[in-house]
Structures are given as C-alpha cells and as structure tokens.
C-alpha cells in the first residue's frame, strides 16, 4: 500500500527534478552539443610555445634562451602533446561528463529534501499532527503508574573517562516511575581504572533507588553492536516494551521519555522515535562550528524530509527510542558494518515499520574537538554506509512489505546519491579534474557544472541554515577537504578494502562541564608525525602548484584564486590547525 506521504514525496521529487532542469535550460546551461567553457581557458597556440620555451631555458644555451629547443626535447614534447590529446584528455573528458550527471543528481536530491523540509516548516506539519500523540500523566508519575510502559535505557561506553558521569546521571534523572525504568550501562572499557569508576557510579545511583544494571563483556567482539546485542540478551530486557539508547556523551532532558514514548504507545506501526542532537561545544573552535552546520543540515533537511514523506531515515545511533518488538523482528543488532544503527533502521523499515523524527526534542551531546577525531568519525560513517549499500541493496529490491516508491527512495536517494555519488563527485571534480584542467587545454568543463550547480547547492544549504551564513565560506573550504576522506571511505566500503570494518571510538573531552569531574589521566605529548596529516599536505601542494601554473600561464582567468584557497585549507588542516579561538561570535 502506497502511503499519502510517499505519493507526496514522489510528486515533490518530480517537481524538484523538473525545476532544476527547467532552470538549467532557461539559463542556457544544459547544452550538450558543445562545451560552454573551458576551465583554465586558453588554446593550443598558447601552450605550444610556452612549455618548449621553458624547457629550453631550463636546459641552458643561447639557442634555448632565444626560443629554440633541441630536437630531442622537441620530440619528447611532441610525444607529451599526443599522449595528452589522445589519451589523457579523452579519459578525463569521460570523467567530466560522468561528474556532470552526478552533479545533476545531487542538485535534484538537495532540492527535493529542502522543498519538503521548507514545506513542513511552512505549514507546521508537526509529528503530533501526522501521528497520534497524547501526554502521559505529566509531572506526577506516581499517579499514572498504570499507563506507563516498561522502558530500558541503554548506555554503551568504552573508556569514557571524561563523560561517563554525565550520561549515567542524565539517564537516572529521567522522569519515569522508578519501577518502570531500567538503566543499563554497557561498559566495554579496557582500562581497569575507568571500569572501576563506572561501576562505582552505577552502585552510587543504585543506592538511591535507581534500577541500574552494570553489564560487561569478556571481549569487544562486534564493538557497539556487540555490546547492545549483549544487553538485549539479559532476562530483564524481555519485560521492556521500549529501548532508549544514548551514547556516553549524550545528556537527555528529564522529560525526554515523556515526550517520545507516547508516539510509540499510540502508533503500533511505529518502531523508532528519533530526537535531534544539540551540542555543548559548538562555539569552541572553527572546527566545531562547521560541524554544527553539517549536522544542522542533516537533521533539518535530510531527516525531516525522510520522516515527512516515507517515514524512513537512518537511526542516528543515539538519542532515539526503539520498540523492542521491531528490533527483534529485524534480527537484532548486527556487527557486519560500522554503521550498526543504519543497518538496523533499514532492516526494520523493510519489515514495514515506520519512523518518526521529532526535531523539537533536542539532546545535548559533544562534537569531536579535534580534526583527527572528526576524520575517524566521518570515515567510519561514510565507509559503513557504502558497505551497507553493497550488502543490503538486494534485500531492499526483493522486500515485500514496502512500496515501490519507498524502495526507489531508499536505493536511489538514501544510498546511491548520499553514500556514493556525493563523496565521489565532490572530490573527483573539484579536487582533481578541475585543477588538472589548467594543464590540459584539450579538456573542456561546462561552466554550469562548476559554477551554476555549486551555487545552487550553496543557496539550498543556506536557506535552511541562515544563522550559519557567516560560517559558509569556511564550511565550503572545510567540506572541500573532507571530500577526499569521504571518497576514500566510500570506496573502501564499496570494495571492502583493508580496514572497511574497523571501529574507532570518537574521543570525548567532557566539554559540557567547567571543572573536570574526575581526575584526568596524564596527557601524552603527541609526536610531530602524529600532528601532521600527509594526505592533506600532499593535496595542498598539488592544488597550489595548479593554482600557480594557472596564474602564470593563464593570468587572464581568475580560477587560480579558488585553487589557492582550496590549497590553503588543505595545508592548514594538514597541520591540524582548526581555529581554536573565539571566532565569528
């Protein structure tokens, strides 16, 4: 059965595609009969004189200085021109048009998501309107104990010295009848000192009457998925109708369960209620500011659009409440990828379950405070998403409990465009092909692909992030750098290369408290090689070289300015400069 939201989503998607193509056509942008512009400009006439002249000058001799070159050098240059024009340029030209197609896919997808998101906001189509929601017994849980279901709160953690007290304390202070709430701490810590502290904290809350369970494992098999699976195997879990999950740095408000659980109670076809993330350290550096912009777009646009149209989106791994039955029917937690949360969400959706995203409910958390930590987090997510696409695509195709429109949305929009196309085209086109084009005059890149489409994506992003407008230039450069890592991660996941299933825990520093609540372990000084990111520095050298080449030999064009900025961004992040100062207040 096709839902009304799915039909509306399909209609909006068709309108977005039509609008994008119509705008491109009216601007004269889409004209495949001839290339509209060549980035780097220039023709063969300029190059045929400049390069041999330089070779001759560098080789020395009066004849070289006068512009002549030896027969040997001329022969080598002729070989280069032929190879460049006959092999390199045609190969890159194919890549250009593939990237153009991918770029159109991106802008249509972004237009669709933003249109839905803006529409939901404009008409006030709140989750409480789309789904039944009635408040429970409110402030006095004791009076309404009979209608309160049994809920378990799971907190997986691994050596979370700086934040373990915050998450455990917030979970234990949730407004819910004491006899209807179980707090389960899943501690995979390998440090005995930290493990002891976490256990003591659990005992402290237990002495206050909280039903808190401390669960450990003999090994970290399956990492977070393995810990959650272990928690679900406990006998007392069988009596719990709903499972709330929070990572160790998340601090839910006391009324979190009162606002989320009623959605599950009154809508038997709903499996998941996802809340939005809020951040306690989003103003500490330029790095955290651009991260916040990234997550704001994800929640405001992508999650909202998926929830409003197809009642499907990816579980964010934390700050959500699951129906226990849905988890079990989907096969429970699996550790086959590094995105166990997305894996469970897709499998549950294939069984016909619906999801609700509630953007008004926000849960405080911590952003990665270092560039290295953020890169490891993004690599895990990008690699895991692409790898899951490889493993579950066929299951989506043959699923019988979802509509054809929903299958299309999951395979095309959710997986193909976001997990594969987006990281590929952004890196290949803007960080490789465009810089190389300044040295290959035979290569033509349509101006609509490197000007109109990026501008359209920028406007679409800004519309839903107006408060972050002053951060936009930094965000553009930062995302340019991150595309290299995300493309490598996507390829690793798709091809299951070495390290595709490697799990790395994101380091937290407990930024939400002014004074550290526990004594920190002694800090070790990082070695120089640990503070330098060679891939980023390598790309910066490449981009700056291309920019300089463009400036010297094609000074009439202004593309070198963009390349210099990209190269500078790569260079700064290559040396781990993330703007740790009060900027853009």
From Swiss-Prot:
User: Chief location of this protein?
Assistant: Golgi
- List all membrane-crossing ranges: 87-107, 420-440, 443-463, 534-554, 563-583
Q: Name one GO cellular component term.
A: Golgi apparatus
Record-listed E.C. numbers: 2.4.1.32
SUPFAM superfamilies from the entry? Nucleotide-diphospho-sugar transferases
Q: Which Pfam families match?
A: Glyco_trans_2_3 (PF13632)
Annotated localization = Golgi apparatus membrane
Positions binding substrate in this chain are 247, 249
Similarity-based family: Belongs to the glycosyltransferase 2 family. Plant cellulose synthase-like A subfamily.
- Quote the protein name from its UniProt record: Probable glucomannan 4-beta-mannosyltransferase 7
Biological source species:
Oryza sativa subsp. japonica
